[in-house]
């Protein structure tokens, strides 16, 4: 085989290798960037979302994040790091389909004189509006990650839900109703723990629920059938860690995983029907 024919042969092989297998369609990909704090990096939520999407028939979600423990959205605005983070992630094309915004804990609500929880709905609304404007200037769609009530104060959810839904409506931005799904699980399966010991942060089951809600919200598809075990980038108290070796992020029983998937889909569907 001469050099010219050999080159043509190799080109043909590369084209065939890249083509979808008969009976299979190429999958769409959504690039999703998460902005927030430890409620995102605990159990590597972006990695869970990505891992769940890999095993389902819908779009594949490729994720990245910019997080700091305890950070408010207003601090992400003021520290000046977010614009460069959004435009300089080397693993993707620097274009995002969605940028998910997560406010600090219950900051979206008014300060609670009973619980002592500090809230600043005006700060929350201003920060979300400013960040959403930046996100849209980059050609992406802002999405809101509704947080949950802490274990000791479940009544917080009413104000949290109203705050996220209100600003979501103002911005015409999708709201991932994680807090509402959390409350539904706590009511229907109080034996299924979603918190770590501090009663605030998510354990692996809590993050798995959040990932199912996020997947359903961003894709419009059901997370039912997602794997009960998800592997991904390991994480520690500062966020995801650089590693060539994937870690087991969550391992649930088949029954618990199916229940969380079903609740996530029910809550997202109910929210969209409002």
Regions found by a protein language model. Give the residues of each.
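Alpha-helical cap/lid subdomain in secreted, periplasmic
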Residues: 88-207, 216-225
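Boundary at the C-terminal end of the N-terminal hydrophobic targeting segment
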Residues: 21-23
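N-terminal secretory signal peptides that target proteins for export/translocation
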Residues: 1-5
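Short alpha-helical patches at coil-to-helix transitions and adjacent helical residues
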Residues: 42, 204-211
């Amino acid at each position: 085989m001469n050099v010219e024919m050999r080159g043509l042969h190799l080109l043909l092989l590369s084209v065939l290798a890249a083509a979808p297998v008969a009976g299979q369609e190429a999958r769409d990909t959504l690039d999703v960037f998460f902005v927030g704090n430890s409620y995102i990096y605990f159990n590597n939520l972006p990695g869970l979302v990505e891992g769940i999407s890999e095993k389902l028939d819908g779009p594949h979600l490729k994720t990245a994040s910019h997080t700091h423990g305890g950070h408010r959205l207003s601090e992400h605005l003021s520290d000046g790091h977010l614009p460069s983070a959004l435009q300089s992630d080397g693993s993707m094309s620097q274009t995002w389909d969605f940028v998910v915004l997560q406010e600090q804990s219950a900051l979206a609500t008014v300060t609670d004189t009973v619980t002592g929880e500090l809230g600043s709905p005006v700060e929350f609304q201003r920060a979300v509006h400013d960040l959403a404007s930046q996100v849209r200037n980059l050609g992406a769609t802002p999405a809101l990650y509704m947080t949950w009530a802490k274990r000791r104060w479940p009544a917080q959810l009413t104000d949290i839900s109203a705050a996220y839904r209100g600003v979501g409506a103002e911005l015409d931005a999708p709201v991932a109703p994680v807090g509402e799904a959390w409350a539904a699980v706590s009511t229907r399966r109080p034996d299924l723990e979603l918190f770590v010991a501090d009663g605030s942060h998510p354990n692996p089951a809590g993050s798995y629920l959040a990932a199912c809600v996020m997947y359903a919200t961003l894709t419009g598809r059901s997370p039912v059938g997602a794997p009960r075990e998800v592997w991904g980038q390991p994480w520690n108290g500062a966020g995801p860690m650089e590693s060539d070796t994937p870690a087991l992020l969550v391992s649930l029983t088949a029954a618990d995983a199916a229940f969380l998937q079903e609740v996530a889909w029910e809550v997202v569907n109910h929210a969209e029907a409002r």
